[in-house]
């Protein structure tokens, strides 16, 4: 690894012109928040339907608010602890330390606010979508309604709800980064590390907690309701139905919004750190200019989702909005690049690295092509994920056919599809990263900055992507409210069924793109980590390469310590995924026992003479989700600390590389296999292979219950895991070097920190493994025999 000069690190300054540009970008971010407010008013202006629908929606709202309030109180304590720990880490001065800790809290607050706002509006718009679909069924004596108009109205309400969440995501992300740059100028990249960590930590907890809640309720509801009792999904007789609908909002809405918000924040962190080195003064503003363009085009894309009569389905209108946004983004970025950036590397003020300043070529070409790679990558992943998860494509149809031979072949078919699709998606992301890397030529910093710019290119589509994702749970909840109330029938029910099918596809597609944003953000952060090692080594007077360079500073994979780090990084991804899935299994078991108890002790539930106790299941899911948060979170934070202080920063870099590689493949495998099982179930429920109630249907329900924690808990949680570990590594790298070399070298301190980190991980995993599989384990007096269903006895 070639040693780089470090004098350029303080050379870049925020010029008056760039300060004005960043201020304008901040105004664009505020405009996104204003537009979100306008969209909120439009959504809430729609009708709410019957009293029965309003009562069900109110129960969902109450459950979602109660869960998120308890979760945020829990995370608030954790955030305060991290605030003070960040003050202990090395920085150039106390102003930087204080700024890093303060903006950690701001990043955490923005991430939580994005998730909360997404959930708050989703639980209010779902009943409005159901009410809009209800208009399709005419009252006695009324003429037939225009189904296309009714469907378009319902689609617009659902997508505008997503648009609000999308605008808050990009608006708050961009506003936070702009505030840091305006306040701290050239020191902004260091302070932004705290902002990114706050966003990433809260997003990971919301992803894990929301995922456990939603899938415990979903799996429990399906196993007892569909498989054992033979009643439909969202049937009001199922005690887990309200919890299932609450989970859709706290998991898919709040979790995904926070996830993409932190991808946004973390990518900007990496782009500004590397931009300052690679593009000097211009590097402090250009990484903000690209996502600002994305904010403007997201506004266009959201309003472009206006269904037409010629559309084959609601997906046609959504795809149209996405591609219009992407194309306009590319055109505007091209204009911005050639207007803002100079035509020669020598004209990049603030760059003192001779390898960059003396480079021939045009920096505008590098910037434009790198951003274009990110935009094109988003479009390609959208199509690739759609191919493996849509009901109209061969892979899902093949899983549907396999249901004729039982649940085992359904599970096997889904696993093989997930494994295969992971390869293609990983290759596509890898090509994107490598293509951007090649743009840098002989300069490693330019190459890494190009990767970060590809990430910002991907970010230009985030506003529309969040809108697409939120569309899924809103349409799913709308169908649930309609079915529980019994007030939407005939054509109206079909409108909601069609919307739900589109929503399943949008959720699967956005998971694929979210994984790509996570990987590009992690890759860019990896570049920032390399820069941190370079700076830290120079501070203690050590070389990074050549004769006499310490082995623990080099990321040479032929060294045993680095190979161990690589394997450990991959292993953490597997352990994290296992913990998340096991948490769902335990909590789902508790839900199954509770729903069975209610059916057994309240026989009147089946003939509607008694009402289930919905609140009991909501309480179980809330308790278990919050209880299970600690172990995955501590693993993500403590594992890099243990590796870094034990094996050194070189092995820690290899650890991050192993985590990024394994995490990419694992996340895609879990997301696509789970999505394909879900849509195979929908395919059978639409009347194929025997339809609802058939053995094929029961087989696909089992497949779907296996896939639920795959696609909605473990898979999505890997995204913030990668970025949390990268940010922790980035923050501790100077401390690891400080206590390993130079005047402050201390083996005792390193060993003490490593032992504490390992003890915390071991204790967290031990406590997690000691918990029972289900609450029935703790109730030996239960005379009922345990189910022999292998999907229940997990």
Swiss-Prot record:
Entry's localization field: Cell membrane
Q: Name one Pfam family in it.
A: H_PPase
EC number, UniProt record: 7.1.3.1
Where along the sequence does the record put site: Determinant of potassium independence?
A: 507
Q: Report membrane topology.
A: Multi-pass membrane protein
Q: Which UniProt keywords apply?
A: Calcium, Cell membrane, Hydrogen ion transport, Ion transport, Magnesium, Membrane, Metal-binding, Translocase, Transmembrane, Transmembrane helix, Transport
Where, in this chain's numbering, is Mg(2+) 1 bound?
218, 222
Query: Membrane spanning segments where?
Result: 20-40, 74-94, 102-122, 163-183, 194-214, 264-284, 285-305, 321-341, 365-385, 422-442, 446-466, 508-528, 564-584, 641-661, 717-737, 747-767
The protein's name in its UniProt record: K(+)-insensitive pyrophosphate-energized proton pump
């Amino acid at each position: 690894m070639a040693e780089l000069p470090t004098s350029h690190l303080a050379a870049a300054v925020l010029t008056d012109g760039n300060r004005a540009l960043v201020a304008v970008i901040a105004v664009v971010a505020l405009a996104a928040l204003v537009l979100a407010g306008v969209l909120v008013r439009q959504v809430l202006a729609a009708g709410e339907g019957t009293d029965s629908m309003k009562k069900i929606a109110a129960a969902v709202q109450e459950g979602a608010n109660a869960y998120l309030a308890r979760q945020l109180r829990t995370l608030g304590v954790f955030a305060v602890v991290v605030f003070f720990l960040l003050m202990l880490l090395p920085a150039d001065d106390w102003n930087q330390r204080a700024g890093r800790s303060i903006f950690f809290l701001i990043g955490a607050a923005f991430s939580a606010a994005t998730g909360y706002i997404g959930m708050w509006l989703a639980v209010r718009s779902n009943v409005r979508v159901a009410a809009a679909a209800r208009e399709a069924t005419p009252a006695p004596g009324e003429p037939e309604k225009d189904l296309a108009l009714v469907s378009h109205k319902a689609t617009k309400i659902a997508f505008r709800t997503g648009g609000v969440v999308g605008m808050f995501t990009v608006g708050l992300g961009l506003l936070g980064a702009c505030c840091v740059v305006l306040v701290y100028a050239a020191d902004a990249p260091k302070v932004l590390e705290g902002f990114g960590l706050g966003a990433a930590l809260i997003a990971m907890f919301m992803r894990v907690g929301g995922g456990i809640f939603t899938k415990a309720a979903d799996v429990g509801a399906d196993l007892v309701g569909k498989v054992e009792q033979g009643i439909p999904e969202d049937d009001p007789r199922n005690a887990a139905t309200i919890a299932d609908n609450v989970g859709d909002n706290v998991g898919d809405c709040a979790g995904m919004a926070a996830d993409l918000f932190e991808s946004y924040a973390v990518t900007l962190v990496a782009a500004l750190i590397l931009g300052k080195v690679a593009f000097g003064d211009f590097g402090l503003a250009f990484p903000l200019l690209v996502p600002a363009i994305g904010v403007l085009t997201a506004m266009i894309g959201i309003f472009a989702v206006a269904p037409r009569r010629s559309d084959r389905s609601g997906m046609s209108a959504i795809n149209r909005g996405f591609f219009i946004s992407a194309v306009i983004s590319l055109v505007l970025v091209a204009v911005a690049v050639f207007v803002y950036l100079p035509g020669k590397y020598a004209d990049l003020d603030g760059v003192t690295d001779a390898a960059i300043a003396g480079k021939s070529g045009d920096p505008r070409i590098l910037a434009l092509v790198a951003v274009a790679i990110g935009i094109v990558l988003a479009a390609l992943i959208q199509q690739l994920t759609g191919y493996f998860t849509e009901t109209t494509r061969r892979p899902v149809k093949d899983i549907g056919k396999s249901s004729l031979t039982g649940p085992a072949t359904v599970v096997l078919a889904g696993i093989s599809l997930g494994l295969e699709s992971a390869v293609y998606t990983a290759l596509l992301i890898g090509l994107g990263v490598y293509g951007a890397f090649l743009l840098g030529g002989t300069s490693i910093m330019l190459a890494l900055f190009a990767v970060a710019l590809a990430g910002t290119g991907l970010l230009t589509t985030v506003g529309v992507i969040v809108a697409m994702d939120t569309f899924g749970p809103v349409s799913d909840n709308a169908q649930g409210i309609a079915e529980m109330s019994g007030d939407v029938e005939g054509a109206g029910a079909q409108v909601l069924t069609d919307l739900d099918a589109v929503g399943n596809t949008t959720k699967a597609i956005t998971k694929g793109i979210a994984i790509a944003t996570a990987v590009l953000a992690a890759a860019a952060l990896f570049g920032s980590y390399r820069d941190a090692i370079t700076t830290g080594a120079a501070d203690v007077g050590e070389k990074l390469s050549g004769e006499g360079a310490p082995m623990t500073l080099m990321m040479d994979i032929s060294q045993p310590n680095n190979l161990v780090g690589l394997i450990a990084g991959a292993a953490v991804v597997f352990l994290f995924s296992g913990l998340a899935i096991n948490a769902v299994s335990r909590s789902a078991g508790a839900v199954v026992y509770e729903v069975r108890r209610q059916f057994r002790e309240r026989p009147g539930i089946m003939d509607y003479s008694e009402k289930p106790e919905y609140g009991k299941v909501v309480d179980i899911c809330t308790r278990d989700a919050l209880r299970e948060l600690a172990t995955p979170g501590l693993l993500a934070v403590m594992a890099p600390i243990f590796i870094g202080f034990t094996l050194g920063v070189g092995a820690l870099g290899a650890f991050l590389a192993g985590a990024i590689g394994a995490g990419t493949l694992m996340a895609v495998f879990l997301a696509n296999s789970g999505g394909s099982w879900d849509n195979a179930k929908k395919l059978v429920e639409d009347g194929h292979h025997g339809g609802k109630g058939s053995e094929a249907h029961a087989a696909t329900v089992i497949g779907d219950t296996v896939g639920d924690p795959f696609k909605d808990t473990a898979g999505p949680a890997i995204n913030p895991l990668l970025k949390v570990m990268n940010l922790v590594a980035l923050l501790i790298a100077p401390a690891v070097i400080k206590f390993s070399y130079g005047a402050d070298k201390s083996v005792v301190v390193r060993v003490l920190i490593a032992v504490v980190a390992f003890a915390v991980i071991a204790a967290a995993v031990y406590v997690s493994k000691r918990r029972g599989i289900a609450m029935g384990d703790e109730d030996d007096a239960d005379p009922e025999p345990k189910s022999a269903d292998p999907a229940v006895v997990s």
